[in-house]
């Protein structure tokens, strides 16, 4: 059975690299890259979906695409890149909690 993989944080270097590599994996049928801004680099044949993991809509994406694997790369290590510590915590903590909740509710993950 081939996998459908969702990769978060594809606009950042590491997330984009993971998405691009997964598109070359023969065991993976479909790769969906998610971020709030389009990636400035190639993500291979991965499909880009503009979405914020802090938004409950992420659950709909998991369900509609029948995602069975999630690779969470949407973490900000430097507060300056997020606009300060508060937005950094919101993205890292609230976003991760929302994504994990969506995974838990999903029938396919």
State what each model feature region is:
Residues 27-38:
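Conserved glycine-rich Rossmann-like NAD(P)H-binding loop of the short-chain dehydrogenase/reductase
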Residues 43-56:
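Rossmann-fold cofactor-recognition segment
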Residues 53-91:
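NAD(P)H-binding glycine-rich loop region in Rossmannoid oxidoreductase-like domains
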Residues 2, 66-67, 109:
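Local beta-strand N-terminus motif with an aromatic residue
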Residues 97-109:
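Conserved Rossmann-fold NAD(P)-dependent oxidoreductase catalytic core, especially the SDR/UDP-sugar
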Residues 69, 95-98:
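Conserved cofactor-binding/catalytic machinery of classical short-chain dehydrogenase/reductase
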Residues 2-27:
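N-terminal Rossmann NAD(P)H-binding glycine-rich loop of SDR-like oxidoreductase domains
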């Amino acid at each position: 059975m081939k996998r459908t993989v969702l990769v978060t944080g594809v606009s950042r270097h590491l997330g984009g690299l993971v998405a691009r590599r997964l598109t070359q994996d023969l065991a993976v049928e479909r790769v969906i890259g998610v971020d709030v801004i389009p990636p400035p680099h190639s993500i291979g044949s991965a499909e880009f979906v503009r979405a914020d993991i802090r938004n409950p809509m992420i659950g709909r994406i998991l369900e509609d695409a029948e995602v069975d694997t999630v690779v969470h790369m949407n973490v900000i290590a430097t507060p300056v890149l997020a606009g300060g510590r508060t937005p950094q915590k919101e993205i890292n903590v609230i976003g991760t909690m929302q994504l994990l909740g969506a995974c838990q509710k999903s029938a396919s993950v």
